[in-house]
């Protein structure tokens, strides 16, 4: 019952997408009904042609028929074109709207959602699932209305000719309904598996493409091929189950219909029935019954399209029903001063996980620089995730200029931070547009060039034919790691936010580039609050305070010299790095 209720809810919700285009949708339905009515009208004239035209040898009937046929087929063809156009126009409008809605909603979902779902699966929702909704639903409506109207017309014609024989034929109704009910459940289950399988195909392909260099360097081609083959075969198997179910159900329904047709022929052979039916009437009745098998087959098959569309829509709506980021804040400031306080902050990524941060307390005064150091997994990057509210704290509070960061509107809060991560994201656009990406106001070419010069981007773009107008390729594939990172730093320079978060910002730079960038960052940090997450201790020696982290806790704090004098964890890290580089 829950499954049926969910299906009805999904169907009603899907109809809501059609509502804005109901005029075109109604026009499509009327054209389809008209198409089926013409087919029924054409069949109804068989009796006249046989009884009056041939049996009575009335040549006028045959001549009128010769004029009637071309006209009726021109009208029939016009209605077919119109119905197909209007229906697919509505279908593409629906999928465009749904795809845009899904894309926009995914951007509003919290970072935690994206961390728990594979990129390939989410891409498959936007590309494959939405397309399935449009294609399957359009085909389902086309067949359902057109063939349904044709079935209604044929049944009316059959009852007009002989209601007794028509009743015998209708015995198949309950049996067909039973078969369709069983098949519907099967279609829905298999279609849902196909959505999941296609998501896995996309994910596996995406991982191989993104990690192509790693795959070939570690001779992982065979393993990746085997993994993809297994997933690909699962998709094939599920599709074959769908095809087999459709073929078997069609054959069963047609067999049931053939038994009913046999009964009609037996009853029609009785003397009293032979006396009632003319040759034309019986031919019309028999033709209508035979013609009824085709739309019955189509209507059985349309169930698979309908169930596939419902399964895809359910998958899409599941994402659309995911709650977006909580933004209850109302405080808006043009530019924050930059005072930051972590007050007894504890946080876990998952409820049952060990805390990523535990009882964290520290303060960063306006214009000061605090560095976070420690081994991987100690909680350094988690602090930047909490500051920008990619995640919300479970215990304690984070203050910005004396106000809880939850009190700020999200857009306003994130506008106060310029984040440069070790994982640089570039878009398939020009270098200049990547630097200017997300700028809160229109920026001049001069400002872009200035930021590029400060981040030493022009050092490599000056040798390029198109300079800053050079396309970077997908995620900056045409550039080196150091070049990508310099573009990200130029983006932060242009953003001119009061607070900087540098998460291993110089990790991909060579020694010469790092020296240039350190000079640029030194200029950038003036009169700005900066939180620097660093692995290379040489980059944070001048920080106002250094926090040493381990297992989500701050175990040491002080200036570079103070921490060296303590001869604790920082002292050991320092010796390890500099003895290794000596």
From Swiss-Prot:
Catalytic reaction list: ATP + H2O + lipid A-core oligosaccharideSide 1 = ADP + phosphate + lipid A-core oligosaccharideSide 2
SUPFAM superfamilies documented for this protein: ABC transporter transmembrane region, P-loop containing nucleoside triphosphate hydrolases
InterPro entries found in the cross-reference section: AAA+_ATPase (IPR003593), ABC1_TM_dom (IPR011527), ABC1_TM_sf (IPR036640), ABC_transporter-like_ATP-bd (IPR003439), ABC_transporter-like_CS (IPR017871), ABC_transpr_lipidA (IPR011917), P-loop_NTPase (IPR027417), Type_1_exporter (IPR039421)
Membrane topology designation: Multi-pass membrane protein
PROSITE patterns xref list: ABC_TM1F (PS50929), ABC_TRANSPORTER_1 (PS00211), ABC_TRANSPORTER_2 (PS50893), MSBA (PS51239)
Residue stretches making up the ABC transporter domain: 340-576
Subunit organization: Homodimer.
UniProt similarity note: Belongs to the ABC transporter superfamily. Lipid exporter (TC 3.A.1.106) family.
Name of the featured protein: ATP-dependent lipid A-core flippase
């Amino acid at each position: 019952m829950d499954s049926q209720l969910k299906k009805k809810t999904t169907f009603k919700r899907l109809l809501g997408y059609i509502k804005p285009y109901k005029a075109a949708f109604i026009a499509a339905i009327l054209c389809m009904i008209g198409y089926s009515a013409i087919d029924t009208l054409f069949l109804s004239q068989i009796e006249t042609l046989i009884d009056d035209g041939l049996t009575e040898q009335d040549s006028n009937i045959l001549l009128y028929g010769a004029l009637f046929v071309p006209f009726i087929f021109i009208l029939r063809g016009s209605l077919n074109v119109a119905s197909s156009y209007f229906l697919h126009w509505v279908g593409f409008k629906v999928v465009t709207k749904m795809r845009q809605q899904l894309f926009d909603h995914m951007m509003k979902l919290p970072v935690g959602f994206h961390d728990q779902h594979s990129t390939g699966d989410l891409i498959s929702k936007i590309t494959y699932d939405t397309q399935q909704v449009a294609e399957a639903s359009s085909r389902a409506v086309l067949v359902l209305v057109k063939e349904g109207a044709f079935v209604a017309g044929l049944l009316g014609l059959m009852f007009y000719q002989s209601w007794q024989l028509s009743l015998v034929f209708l015995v198949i109704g309950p049996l067909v309904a039973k078969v369709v009910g069983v098949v519907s459940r099967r279609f829905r289950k298999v279609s849902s598996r196909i959505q999941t399988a296609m998501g896995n195909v996309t994910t596996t392909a995406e991982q191989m493409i993104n990690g192509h260099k790693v795959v070939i360097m570690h001779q992982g081609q065979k393993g990746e091929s085997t993994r993809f083959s297994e997933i690909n075969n699962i998709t094939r198997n599920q599709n074959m189950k769908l095809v087999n179910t459709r073929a078997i159900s069609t054959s069963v329904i047609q067999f049931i219909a053939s038994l009913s047709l046999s009964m009609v022929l037996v009853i029609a052979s009785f003397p009293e029935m032979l006396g009632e039916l003319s040759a034309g009437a019986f031919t019309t009745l028999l033709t209508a019954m035979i013609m009824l098998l085709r739309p019955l087959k189509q209507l059985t098959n349309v169930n698979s399209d309908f169930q596939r569309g419902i399964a895809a829509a359910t998958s899409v709506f599941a994402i659309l029903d995911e709650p977006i980021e909580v933004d209850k804040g109302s405080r808006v400031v043009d530019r924050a001063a930059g005072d930051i306080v972590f007050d007894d902050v504890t946080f876990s990524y998952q409820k049952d996980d060990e805390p990523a941060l535990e009882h964290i307390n520290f303060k960063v005064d306006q214009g000061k620089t605090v560095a976070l150091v420690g081994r991987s997994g100690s909680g350094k990057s988690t602090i930047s995730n909490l500051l920008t509210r990619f995640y919300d704290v479970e215990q304690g509070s984070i203050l910005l200029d004396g106000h809880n960061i939850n009190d700020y509107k999200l857009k306003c809060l994130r506008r106060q931070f310029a984040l440069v991560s070790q994982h640089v994201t570039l878009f398939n656009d020009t270098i200049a547009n990547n630097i200017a990406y997300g700028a809160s106001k229109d920026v001049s070419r001069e400002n872009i060039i200035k930021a590029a010069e400060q981040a030493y981007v022009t050092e490599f773009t000056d040798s390029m034919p198109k300079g800053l107008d050079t396309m970077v390729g997908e995620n900056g594939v045409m550039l080196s790691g150091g070049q990508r990172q310099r573009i990200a730093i130029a983006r932060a320079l242009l953003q001119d936010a009061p607070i900087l978060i540098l998460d291993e910002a110089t990790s991909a730079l060579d020694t010469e580039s790092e020296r240039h960038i350190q000079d640029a960052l030194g200029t950038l940090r003036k009169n700005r609050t900066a939180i620097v997450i660093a692995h290379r201790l040489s980059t944070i020696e001048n920080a106002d305070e250094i926090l040493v982290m381990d297992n989500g806790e701050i175990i040491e704090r002080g200036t570079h010299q103070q921490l060296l004098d303590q001869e604790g964890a920082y002292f050991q890290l320092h010796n390890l790095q500099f003895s290794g580089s000596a």
